[in-house]
Each structure stands twice: as C-alpha cells, then as structure tokens.
Amino acid sequence: MINILYAGSVSACFELENNTAYYSGEKYNVRLNGEEVMTSDRNVFSLYPLKPKTEYTVEVNGHEPVHFTTISEACAVSVKDFGAVGDGVHDDTENIQTAVNCLPQGGRLYFPEGTYSTAPINLKSHITLDLAENAVLLGSTDVSRYPVIPGTVTDIVTGEEVHTGTWEGNAIPMHQALLFAEHSEDIRI
C-alpha cells in the first residue's frame, strides 16, 4: 500500500507501507502518470517538481496506484525578484522578509540554488517556502540578531498573563527561531 504523507502545490511525499523500517528491502520503480521517474529502496519518497492544481497517479511495482491532486496556489515568485542575492555573504534578511510580507494567501516563495544569509524571518499563514535543491538558508551567527521572546507578558487591559512562547512546555524567555511563526497556520516548507 502507498500512503500519501503530503501533497503541496509542487511536491508530494509518499510512504511505502511494509514490514521494514526505513528501507523496503529491495529496489522499486516509481511511475508518475505512467512515466518512470525514479528508482528507490526507501520507504518514504518525494516527487517534485509537480504542477499546481494537477491530477496525478503514482504507481509502485506490486502496489495499487494512488491518485492525488496537487493544491492550487495564488502565485509563485522568486526571492531574487525582491533583491535577495544568495551568495552566502550578502545579508538577505530584509529581501526575504519583504518577499514574505508581499505574498498573498496561497502564495509560494521560491529560493533558487544559492546560500541566503539571514537573521530570523517572520512567516505568516497560508504560504509556501520552496527551496530548490542546493538552496540553503544560512542563519546569522550573531545572537544579537535573534530577538528574545519573553515567556509571558501581562495584558495591559485585563492584567492577565499571556504566554508568548514555550520551551518544552515551559513559558520561559527564548531567542526567536530562524523561521518564526506565531499564531499562524498552513505554512509549507
């Protein structure tokens, strides 16, 4: 049996169900819409690049075919269109953040091959970050570039404690992550 683990706008991930961990024990061929696209021996495999809002059939020898449809997207833009350089030296933080801020719901931000040096990026709901093969987000080594999020703050109207972040279930101060999302959903990376 083939299980669909994920189907985005331009990629999909599948699990080959069997009695072994990680590897299937033998190589198998994967066909996408009848065309052989890969050979693998891993229980989990991904297919990309795919086209948004398109019907596909995946076949693996000895298993029932699986039909799925990729999701639609509002637009797909390159981070380089916002001035990101991707050379590992230039600070691309503002360029990446501007691109994220400009994405509409359902938008996809594409990172071509390169190394994008950055401080934390604030994400938002209903977007996709799509990194090409050999595209790297290189986090700054300067800890002062990572804001500290207090574990709790006080609501100025009600006086109640508001949790702003937790570490292993505890509301304690912590540095913001390289990719950060608060009160957000449906973010695909």
Annotate each PLM feature.
Residues 1-189:
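Extracellular/periplasmic carbohydrate-active domains that bind, remodel
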